[in-house]
Amino acid sequence: MNLPRFFEDLSRACSGVVLLLSTAVLSAAEPSLPKVSLHTEPNASLRNEVRQAIAKGLGWLEKSQNTNGFWSTADYPAITALGLAAFEMQPANREHKTTPPAVQRGYAYLLSCVQSNGGIYRKELPSYNTSVSLTALVLANRPEYQPAILKARKFIMGLQTDLNEPGRIDSPFDGGIGYGMQDKNPDLSNTSLALEALYLSKQYVKDHHLEEAGDLNWQAAIHFLQCCQNLPASNAEPWASNDPQNKGGFIYAPGRSMAGETNLPSGRVALRSYGSMSYAGLLSYIYADLKRDDPRVVAVMDWLRGNFTLEENPGMGPQGLFYYYHTLAKALTLYGTETVETSAGRNVKWREDLALKLINLQRADGSWANENGRWFEKDPALVTAYALIALDMIYGKI
């Protein structure tokens, strides 16, 4: 398989990207690792430290895997898929492809979750679990997974929202994808996961000369994305705002921001843009083949530069912090920038700063976890996979 071109751009050391959810409780606090100075100059030593951190994190995943092949819970195959992605993307696979027993068990469990409709899930969150699992199957690059890949693609494409008149884009929700349950509207988080899986698997299908019918309505997907962006020039929704704090950033879904709302001097109420969804929006635009000079891409990059920080998830504080790190690493890598110029005029070498941040946050046993439990980030299996994927992408270019 010739990996998609952007896989190489990720870091020259990894072979994919991914996201997800989990359900577990953080274990008792553990002793901290020796801290790395945030003022250390980037060099071969830092690169070695990143590789060591990755190896230690993967070791923790191997030891913490359930004997049935899943991580954290059997109810959500997406959790296991994220762990598998971390293994597939590790730097060692650049030199010699390895398939340790934990990976073999993980894929066996994943395939046990394949449903007759092509989805990869147990009982809940069919879109969420299928999207992340599809990405992991593509990363494995094994011919025996091709039938599951094709069926999962068809399943995800069938979940794209089309409200009101069929075939006509006449709702802000048209084109998006939600959790895959009838009572759930589409949201940017699930849509970005689905677009990622479909983009990667489309390249896989092309590389292997496989036959399939149909494709996602990408124009409708772009419509949904811009309906989640604070940019009145391309979003006619009444909440979209040009105010300096929010212009260009993204929210969770049309009319809904996890970061709440703010009263503007004009008397209008704006929905607050926030960090993790803004990086998810940038990623999704890239998957949808929007170019760097597209006004929608320019606007979100302006917001991200103005709100760049590794101390919090902008607009959300510590909530979803590792999801933020993971999405930031993917988005800035695919966008193709070595530095981020902040609103203060500082050019940040984001890879080096993020690598040091993650090394400092790694626990003594090799895992990571967030002290804030929102979105299940007290689960070390989830957060360790987030951190490892970010480090995998960073490794090749520091």
Where are these regions (language model features)?
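Bacterial N-terminal signal peptides that target proteins for export
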Residues: 2-17
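Short amphipathic alpha-helical/adjacent loop interface patches that line ligand
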Residues: 10, 14, 58, 107, ...
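Generic short amphipathic/hydrophobic targeting helices enriched at N-termini
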Residues: 13-14, 21, 32
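Hydrophobic h-region of N-terminal signal peptides that target proteins for export
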Residues: 20-27
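An alpha-helical repeat/solenoid feature that recognizes helix-turn-helix modules
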Residues: 30-56, 70-102, 116-154, 158-356, ...
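A non-catalytic alpha/beta surface segment that caps or lines the substrate-entry region
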Residues: 65-66, 114-115
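Active-site-surrounding "flap" and adjacent substrate/cofactor-binding loops of secreted or lumenal enzymes
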Residues: 100, 107-110
